[in-house]
Amino acid sequence: MGVSYISNIFVNTKGVSITPFNNKHVSSVYDNQNNIVTKLDKEKTPYVSYEDLPDVFIDALLCTEDVRFFTHNGIDIPRILSAIKTNLSSNSYAQGASTLTQQFIKNTMLTSNKTLKRKFEEMYLAHKIEKIYSKKEIIELYVNYICFDGINPGVNHASLKYYNKPINLVTLPEAALLVGIVNLPTYYNPFKNPVAATKRRNEVLDLMVKHNRLSHYQAEVAKSFPIEKMLYKSNKQEKEYPFQAYLDIVYSQIEDLTGLDPFTTPMKIYTYLDTTLQAEIDLMQKNNSSYLKFTNDLQQFAASIINNENGSIIAAFGGRNYNGQRLFNRAYDMVKQPASTIKPLLSYALAYEHLNWSDKHTVLDDTTYYPNTNQEVNNVDFKHMGEMMIDEAIGYSRNTIAVKTLQEVVGLIGKDKVLEYLKSINLLDTNSFNYSYALGAFEYGVSPTQLAAAYGMLANQGIYKTPLAVKEIVLLENNKKISFTIQSKRILNNDSVYLLNSVLESMMSKNFWNINSICPKNVQISAKTGTSSFDEKVLTDFNYPKNAYKDRWLAGYCKNITIAAWTGFDTTLKEQKTYFIPNNTDANVVKTFFKRIMDIAAKKNQSYDKPDSIVTIPIVKGSNPYLLPTQSVNKNYIINAQFKKDSIPSLYICEPTITQFIEYDYFLSKDKVTILLANDLFDKKETTNKIFDYEKIYGNLEVICEISHDYTTSTFILDSSINEIPLSYKQISTINVYYKYKNGHNTGPFNNKIIIY
């Protein structure tokens, strides 16, 4: 199993042995303190040949997973086309149509992320494999390398575990159960969820009837066997695999970097494993932690923890019930759309790098469209909040501002530079650009390890470090040492990241959505959450609540460690709670996990040094472009802001020129003049939130009336549409009406009229 094994398919001949290579020496693994943590003395599992498989098992497998297996060439074209049509119409990839050959490829070489790209990869490799191996050999590979119980490879493992008998002795109802649980072994675990397992077994039996492998009577008889009575309840404790989620990452990286398989090439393996953290995570994976509890059996979890000092992976949450070797590792192999966790990394990191923003920058949340389209950018609440500080925009996760910011960045540096940036932090999942990237709507997605490493770049003042779990290997055959260096590269300038970190720290201190609950005492945390929503068609088709969402991320860091955690579901299922809704605590496990890891590993009372290139100066709050205050500006409208030295503002605020002209009428009566103004002149302004307004600085804009006679001028403030002004003289007078700020000096254009008595 694994990359090195599958590679043999393409370079060697049909006669290559598929049983594990035996060697008198075995590999050993060491933690970050050079203590041995395990030896790779692989458990001997009886290899199952095709001839060992009973007909009832083969029939159940093919009727359920691949009914045309013996007639296609690795690709079931009708099912593929049907699935693609369904997925495109629903704008999702929930529908699958993998043949057995494709499933084998997916589980031994590719990620299990449901994308069209992966489907095409499966199709290509499946077609190639079917030219090398016979149909019976492919089934043989499948049943020996797929984890039927979700833990150990091979159907024989599952058969011995559940029935205490080898696969060749299983009965029809036993075979149907084994086939039924393989696609969701955790949920359909017959020991933990016998009701769901029974329902699934019966579905398999019905499929066998549908495809004429059973009579209706035979199926009903098989359904009559209670699952609880079929199972073998052993007193033998199931084998434990300590630290396995982390170790599987180590094995994958060794294969990727050297092409060597630690299970077949004996070696000493030195890692960055933090056993204290990983032991805590192991308890969480088994749902045995007093800090973290899961209540939904279908809910999954994944996380990666990185040491910021050297960029190493020090612990990983590979998935719930992660107990076995070389399982699908959600911390390393799974990719999901990063949602709003991308905002600090993309729009705002590039804004501070290229747009020279201050940490007190003001932005506007208003109606926004994706560039060159008529598609509106919606916030999660479908509302707009007006002007706000940048820390509020991140805290409230305003989508409009993230998209507008990215658009401004693209306007300055171009789309190609944005793609280069994403590639430099290993978050580029396609070579095409899309403004929806600003919201984390990637074509495929990122893994928790990828996201943690990217956030680690912010923790490391702009230096990206390629995440490694393996430090060094020593081959036992010749004592050859192979060391692996974590590559470091500056991506963003130190001062840009310092300003962004200042914003994130301010955002955390304001405790948006109770985000500050993840912070241990005396530890400065910067973090961002993210949620992915369902397409409207999926909500309708699956009868989910309108406010249901797919998953939740939490990514963040203190000075010494970075964490990226995800929770969600492997598969979207009808009539099952494979979704979250607001105010439901199930998704909050990312916060609980984050806080617990920080409690254990975060160093207290650490902060970032302020670069010499950063200066702090007072500006008029909310001004954009930035304005320096004069002595007349009230201190309530002044805020200290940090800037790069080469982008300090130089323009002082000054009273604006008033250009509005006021139309009015008047009529005379005894001893007074009545001035008539438009009814809407005194209407209240829009209530849209504004941080900066000249009326806050210079007072309200007032309507002034001057009545002049000879060398005497009387001034009145008009405050309604009808204004009566007494006159003490009956001669020719001049009347002027104009705007003026209450505390200002400038006046608007005069509208002079002559009063003749």
Regions found by a protein language model. Name each.
Residues 1-286, 290, 313-314:
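Juxtamembrane regions of bacterial inner-membrane/periplasmic proteins
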Residues 28, 33-46, 157, 161, ...:
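Short pre-catalytic segments that frame enzyme active sites
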Residues 53, 63-76, 89-94, 130-136, ...:
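Bacterial peptidoglycan biogenesis and beta-lactam-recognition machinery
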Residues 89-113, 235-239, 356-418, 434, ...:
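Conserved catalytic neighborhood of penicillin-recognizing serine enzymes
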Residues 271-292, 304-305, 316, 323-334, ...:
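A penicillin-recognizing enzyme superfamily signal
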Residues 673-683:
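Conserved aromatic anchor
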Residues 725-733:
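Surface-exposed, short loops/turns at beta-strand junctions within beta-sandwich domains
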Residues 744-755:
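Extracellular fibronectin type III
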